[in-house]
Amino acid sequence: MSSQSYRERTLVSVIGDDDTVTGMLLAGTGQVNENGDKNFFIITQKTTDEQIAEAFDDYTTKRKDIAIVLINQFAAERIRDRIENHVQAFPAVLEIPSKDDPYDPEKDSILRRVRKIIGE
């Protein structure tokens, strides 16, 4: 990937519950492009794993303007295979806690990769 393509990645996307997404939108991360594509996806009780996976795939493979994907850890657990298979540097995928689900470092794929590299 050229350095020019890295420069085009300027957005943070969010996949999470309504409280997490609302907080990130209030912080100024929300964006809707000229095609009506949003850089955020709200998970409700009716959201399927396939819908979460579709949003993740959109942000990590189709969109070339996303630099970081923030995903609630409970949502990452629902699509763990896709999280584990994402190995590109950009967009970076970071698992974050939600209001109702505390962060568990043992489930974090990035932390597991780091521990494997350093031999823990």
UniProtKB/Swiss-Prot annotation:
Principal subcellular localisation of the protein: membrane
Function: Subunit of the V1 complex of vacuolar(H+)-ATPase (V-ATPase), a multisubunit enzyme composed of a peripheral complex (V1) that hydrolyzes ATP and a membrane integral complex (V0) that translocates protons. V-ATPase is responsible for acidifying and maintaining the pH of intracellular compartments.
Gene Ontology cellular-component annotations: cytosol; fungal-type vacuole membrane; membrane; nucleus; vacuolar proton-transporting V-type ATPase, V1 domain
Subunit structure: V-ATPase is a heteromultimeric enzyme composed of a peripheral catalytic V1 complex (components A to H) attached to an integral membrane V0 proton pore complex (components: a, c, c', c'', d, e, f and VOA1).
Keywords: Hydrogen ion transport, Ion transport, Membrane, Transport, Vacuole
This protein's record includes keyword Lipid biosynthesis: no
Gene3D superfamilies assigned to the protein according to its UniProt record, in alphabetical order: ATPase, V1 complex, subunit F
InterPro entries, A to Z: ATPase_V1-cplx_f_g_su, ATPase_V1-cplx_fsu_euk, ATPase_V1_fsu_sf
Keyword Nucleotidyltransferase on entry: no
Protein family (similarity comment): Belongs to the V-ATPase F subunit family.
Disulfide bonds: none
Organism: Schizosaccharomyces pombe (strain 972 / ATCC 24843) (Fission yeast)
Alphabetical GO biological process terms: proton transmembrane transport
Record membrane topology: Peripheral membrane protein
Name recorded for this polypeptide: V-type proton ATPase subunit F
Compartments where found: Vacuole membrane
Annotated transmembrane regions: none
Pfam families, A to Z: ATP-synt_F (PF01990)
Molecular-function GO term, any one: proton-transporting ATPase activity, rotational mechanism
